[in-house]
Amino acid sequence: MRVGFIGLGSQGGPMAHAIVDGGFPTTLWARRPESLEPYAGTGATFAESPAALAEASDVVCLCVVGDDDVRGLAYGEDGLLEHMSSGDTLVIHSTIHPDTCREVGEKAAAKGISVVDAPVSGGAPAVEAKQLLVMA
């Protein structure tokens, strides 16, 4: 399984590290290139765009701030859904409005892409202790 991860902040960063450390082939993308620096030498690869990340991944994880960020990444220029394949899965770890998740899910389903609404709780310490609560 090839994993793509977007959202390398205080919550998503440790999650992405855990995926990389778990040995999964992982592709990362960040709006701010400096967010990728902690992953140099880890085995993770870096995508030039969300579209490139989508094409390199079977599962794409989003851990971004909110509804507008999720929509922008899903449908915007270089949008994930346009470049993901049927059978792929989009996992939304962001805390977003249920209507946003339904909207993304409907558009994804039309392309054969699954969406999992999986917000997380516990922060970086829980990730590092491998005790992150995922509400799926």
Where in the sequence are the language-model features?
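NAD(P)+-binding Rossmann beta1-loop-alpha1 motif at the extreme N-terminus of oxidoreductases
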Residues: 1-62, 88, 124-127
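Rossmann-fold dinucleotide-binding core
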Residues: 3, 95-136
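Short, well-ordered alpha-helices that flank and scaffold nucleotide-derived cofactor binding pockets
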Residues: 17, 21, 75, 106
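Short beta-strands and strand-loop turn motifs
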Residues: 29-31, 92, 117
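Short alpha-helix adjacent to the SAM-binding motif of class I
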Residues: 38-39, 72, 103
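Rossmann-like NAD(P)-binding element
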Residues: 47-99
